Amino acid sequence: MTVGYDEEIPFEQVRAHNKPDDAWCAIHGHVYDVTKFASVHPGGDIILLAAGKEATVLYETYHVRGVSDAVLRKYRIGKLPDGQGGANEKEKRTLSGLSSASYYTWNSDFYRVMRERVVARLKERGKARRGGYELWIKAFLLLVGFWSSLYWMCTLDPSFGAILAAMSLGVFAAFVGTCIQHDGNHGAFAQSRWVNKVAGWTLDMIGASGMTWEFQHVLGHHPYTNLIEEENGLQKVSGKKMDTKLADQESDPDVFSTYPMMRLHPWHQKRWYHRFQHIYGPFIFGFMTINKVVTQDVGVVLRKRLFQIDAECRYASPMYVARFWIMKALTVLYMVALPCYMQGPWHGLKLFAIAHFTCGEVLATMFIVNHIIEGVSYASKDAVKGTMAPPKTMHGVTPMNNTRKEVEAEASKSGAVVKSVPLDDWAVVQCQTSVNWSVGSWFWNHFSGGLNHQIEHHLFPGLSHETYYHIQDVFQSTCAEYGVPYQHEPSLWTAYWKMLEHLRQLGNEETHESWQRAA
């Protein structure tokens, strides 16, 4: 299709070009055809995740040094209509006609200055943005630990030794996930896009699907942390079926996919059993990975959709679908069939369940404390833009722009020291919705795969987690300079207990008044 730079292309037309061999995307109101660029893209085919989507967040966060205007012009084919800005009819309704394709603003200096300072710090310390010998050593040790644990699980006494080996397998699988595949599927494990792809495949090795994880984490959680889509939220509260054609990717499936079993957002309708979620929640966390492996992954490849996120950019390709099923079959062979053959069916299935429960518990513990804890913000799309009535403050539950640190930051802006930055700035929202723990610690940074530096990771997902403790002080000082919240807890254990208390508060507070009306 030949079009000019100024030709208007409706977003619904962009949405239709969502296949690996026909990929359009929208960035800052301009439309690009990246189909041919994907084969030569320095980051590999991760660019295809943008197919058919509003991709400003992906573009900004994965290009720390920026992109040449000449490259952008080469693939630009038009612009979004004025007043639409990438929004479909449903978005225009919920955003009250706002012109932005996404509900974030990008006009402040905060993120630009942060990028410049981070790049300068890494250059000063001689650290590459991706890769590093520490990652390779750790990856080798983790893979040896994973396969050794699997071997011992299949050969030791199933009544004791094999159980310990299964728990060990779960722990190593969790850290393969946080320390190898996480960086790999973010394009941050190595400079080589092929090495990153192999690192990303280690998630398939432990039983889950790296491609499904991309939709859940890269397209869902990272751009829209702790935010719930209005239409999606209304569906969950009222029980009314939502037309998936009207749904976009603007929601956080990583955090809120446990509803109604758990209430992790103040906009969700409260059920009677939520008052006990701080008690049963830690047990539920253990089922996180087995649910993903057995049900979620398969559902996504069959429906070509993860909740409200379109998955055609991967699963419209027979090659990707074949890879999915081949990897699933292989993991069933060595993680289920082999233990059942060596230890007997009952013991084999028991050991598989123990391994996954352990893996889920470790992963959920280190992940949930970063986003579900007192002090973080929650919001719907409308609340971020202020088109909804100001949210009611609830004890222990903090809607967007209403945490103590945010209020103090706003108050301090009247002075001459702190620079002003809008609270709906994308980078600010990431700081509002994330929490660090054990900051600056080399040990915890490596042990958790960088999850303890969650704010740094969310603003720069394309950086290797090996770099986070080198740039942590840059983040903290820049946030203070701009009056942006930077919440950090002294340890994982402190964060964990605060998370449990926050679960108790969420389970006992009344449903946010706007959702009560909607229901």
From Swiss-Prot:
The keyword Cell cycle does not apply. The cytochrome b5 heme-binding domain acts as the direct electron donor to the active site of the desaturase, and does not require an external cytochrome. PANTHER family: DELTA(5) FATTY ACID DESATURASE C-RELATED, FATTY ACID DESATURASE 2. It comes from the Eukaryota. This is Acyl-lipid (7-3)-desaturase. It catalyses: a (7Z,10Z,13Z,16Z,19Z)-docosapentaenoyl-containing glycerolipid + 2 Fe(II)-[cytochrome b5] + O2 + 2 H(+) = a (4Z,7Z,10Z,13Z,16Z,19Z)-docosahexaenoyl-containing glycerolipid + 2 Fe(III)-[cytochrome b5] + 2 H2O; a (7Z,10Z,13Z,16Z)-docosatetraenoyl-containing glycerolipid + 2 Fe(II)-[cytochrome b5] + O2 + 2 H(+) = a (4Z,7Z,10Z,13Z,16Z)-docosapentaenoyl-containing glycerolipid + 2 Fe(III)-[cytochrome b5] + 2 H2O. Its cofactor is Fe(2+). Keywords: Electron transport, Fatty acid biosynthesis, Fatty acid metabolism, Heme, Iron, Lipid biosynthesis, Lipid metabolism, Membrane, Metal-binding, Oxidoreductase, Transmembrane, Transmembrane helix, Transport. GO terms for biological process: long-chain fatty acid biosynthetic process; unsaturated fatty acid biosynthetic process. Belongs to the fatty acid desaturase type 1 family.
